[in-house]
Amino acid sequence: MAEKTDYKATLNMPRTDFPMRANLPTREPEQLKKWEEMDLYNLVQRATAGRPKFVLHDGPPYANGDIHLGTALNKILKDIIVKHATMAGYDAPYVPGWDMHGLPIELRALKDMNIDRRKIDPLELRAKCYEYAHHWLNVQREQFKRLGVRGDWENPYRTVAPEFEAKEVEVFGAMAAKGYIYRGLKPVYWCPYCETALAEAEIEYNEKTSYSIYVRFPVVDPRGKLPEGSYLVIWTTTPWTIPANLAVAVHPEVEYGVYATEKGNLVVATALAEKFFQAVNLPAAEPVATLKGADLEGITYRHLLYDRVSPVILGDHVTTEDGTGLVHTAPGHGHEDFEVGQKYGLPVLNPVNDQGVFTAEAGPFAGMFIEKANPEIIKALDEAGMLLGQGKIRHQYAHCWRCKNPVIYRATVQWFVKVEGFMDIAKEAMNHVRWIPDWGYNRMYAMIDGLADWCISRQRAWGLPIPILTCSACDEPSFEPKMFEKIAEIFRAEGSDAWWRRPAEDFMPEGGLTCKKCGGRTFHKEKDILDVWFDSGSSHVGVLETRPELTWPADLYLEGSDQHRGWFKSSLLTAVVARDGKPPYKAVLTHGFTVDEQGRKMSKSLGNVVDPADVIKRYGADILRLWVASTDYRHDMALSENILKQVADAYRKIRNTLRYLLGNLYDFNPDTDMVERDDLLEIDRWQMHRLQEVIRKVTEAYREYEYHIVYHTLNNYCAVDLSAVYLDILKDRLYTSAPASRERRSAQTVLYHVADALIRMLTPILTFTAEEAYSHLPKPAGSPPTSQLLMMPQPDPAYLDENLAAEWDRLMELRDAVQVVLERARVDKLIGSSQEAAVNLYASGGEGSWAELLDRHLPDLPSIFIVSDVKLFVGGQSAPSGTYFGEGPGDLSVEVVRAEGEKCERCWNYRKVGAIEQHPTLCERCAGVVLSLNLDNA
């Protein structure tokens, strides 16, 4: 008896070493090692030299602690953009940077040293800070590399580098030369815990419980406008500022009423009277007199705690939204108070020291910390008969961005940038920038419009010193250009530590300095340091203009939406002054913050923090990268365990699609086996048309930075177009055709083009997986060693055929209708697999009938429906009304019956078998293929 033939061995089943299980946490580090061995960054830079430049300037993360989800999101977005730019034909260098000065690092260094900063030599403290910052630079560098981010990691920019510091001095000097740097007494944000001034960008607003008090000041001189026994009523949530009260402000156009009460004749805005009486538990009353705020100007009152007489003044900042419409004014503790006080020549009283403790000027409260003094001040007001009511409120209040404690407004002598002098120049520069999304322009405009002068001095040690020498005789600062040149020269050679090592004379230009005010020749160095936002805000000069591979301005800045008031703003302000009105960037892209699935901010207290290191450990960096691409970054970006699982599921579908494509290309050589367009089967030409549409959509989405569209397009293409339709239809042809037949090579040609295009389009996003797939893809001779050196695919017009696509779209519509009927037959167990079925189609044959289309494609229909046979009945044949029947599109009806014939042992279709004697269990097609393979064992 002849030995039975193993027909399975005659099938072209998929085979590939590209694993089904990704095992990314293990494989990704192996890939990183390979990239390191090939010196990937420099390899790419050499290969792209001479192309047009695309420069994304890295906003420097702070070198303090592990990266968090927001940092990871930011770096991944940048990497997607840079890699796409390379593959789109640009030379796209990426120089990562770090912000390495500043308060958080200094505080941590002091904590580690367990020492009071007043008792340590500044150079010793700075050395510790330098060491601490570089430790975290190295930690973060490895964490960023683990994300798959490609960059010049061995040569990053650092705001502590001598060359950077020298350039920053030059920027400062350029601003000073134009008169935009000055020293002055003004109220600024002050952190009594960190003992330093803060800029607006260093403030965050959090919930705080504060005292809410209503206070009456007895009128001294009513100037004939108020009755005897009148009181001015103010409301405040900062009782500690009452000792510094020097005026009461009213709005000139607001109506005020005089209300006769058991507490005297109380003056409040009529619009707020009802709320006021409720708040202080007084019976509602009608005013005995009304007058405009302008009538109250010049009236005086007595501050009973200090027996001080002060005036009523006018201020447009006064509103009737809350309180009484009369504003307690302390020029030493508020920006608006200070401004209006200057108009009236009020002194600036600031009875609070650097630590937030009252000085002797506060009288009985001297020595008390302001927050602890609040109850004592309230008690004193009550005893003096000034307190009308008290309570507590929850409200948004300014906090220090680093120590998270409440800050105060405090008038001190600080260094400022006179923003008002060039605000209009900055606004004009904004018109030459592309803002992504568009609302970024309005956000930025709001930050610049009416911006208060920028406080740039900090009372700390770890930072770039304010490069100013001041006359020791009259305290007049020097802005001599040659002085700035000398300071920059020394910093370039020695770093800014030289400021603490060298005497002031060393920083003077040749011939010394002469004070322009008093003629003095002796100068001393400024003790304050520069705001870190001045550091990073100067990076466009310190990096873009000093690194030969980069260009000024940058093509793109990309950061979170909080940077409109941070790096975007500080960079714009320094650039328009130092570089003659030009912005430092051509485009600014903004992304949202990371939140949990419910849209809540991530916090340890809520237990909803997602650690990128944990995600990488459990899922791999490519899952994190896919999440970044899948989410519309223009809004806040949600991540949770549930969302991670959804992303991982989408990743598996993409990976399985790649694996299937590669598995069917094991014997395909693109140099010798490619089928020309006109020789492709029609369904394959249709799929090539679909591929061009996908490429076109993805190309446009990449160009517009819309990565969520890239993701959804490719995800749907893999899951629907390929896996659910085309690849399903192809299986019979791929597996059962002769290996080198036109039918199989036609399919493989398409699979190669699809795999090649997918790898290219996925490389910027799934950077590890695309590289892994590329290593398993059959490649033409001369292909680059990494997918990152491939070019992005471009739509090929030769494959775009709208008429063909319209026909096949109709056939796919019919396929959907057939599958509905097949499923009913399967549920009722008429059939098991769809190959046990045959389909009968009934068409009317009239005008607009499907008959012509179906007749032309009749040989293709069994493979399209994945059934054993399809028959078409046109015109007079009446459609059945049996169980397995359904309406198709248009004039079609669909019937499913069991297929006739026997099951072919090789292809499993039901057809006539045994036509070829040597293979009695095979259909004629399969027997012919087997004979051609010379594998007959019969």
UniProtKB/Swiss-Prot annotation:
Zn(2+) binds at residues 904, 907, 923, 926. It catalyses: tRNA(Ile) + L-isoleucine + ATP = L-isoleucyl-tRNA(Ile) + AMP + diphosphate. A motif ('KMSKS' region) lies at residues 601-605. It is an enzyme of class 6 (ligase). A motif ('HIGH' region) lies at residues 61-71. ATP binds at residue 604. GO terms for biological process: isoleucyl-tRNA aminoacylation. GO terms for molecular function: aminoacyl-tRNA deacylase activity; ATP binding; isoleucine-tRNA ligase activity; tRNA binding; zinc ion binding. Its cofactor is Zn(2+). Keywords: Aminoacyl-tRNA synthetase, ATP-binding, Cytoplasm, Ligase, Metal-binding, Nucleotide-binding, Protein biosynthesis, Zinc. Coiled coil: none annotated. PROSITE patterns: AA_TRNA_LIGASE_I. InterPro entries: aa-tRNA-synth_I_CS, aa-tRNA-synth_Ia, Anticodon_Ile_BEm, Ile-tRNA-ligase, Ile-tRNA-ligase_type1, Ile-tRNA_ligase, M/V/L/I-tRNA-synth_anticd-bd, Rossmann-like_a/b/a_fold. Belongs to the class-I aminoacyl-tRNA synthetase family. IleS type 1 subfamily. This is Isoleucine--tRNA ligase. The lineage of its organism: Bacteria, Bacillati, Bacillota, Clostridia, Eubacteriales. The gene is ileS.
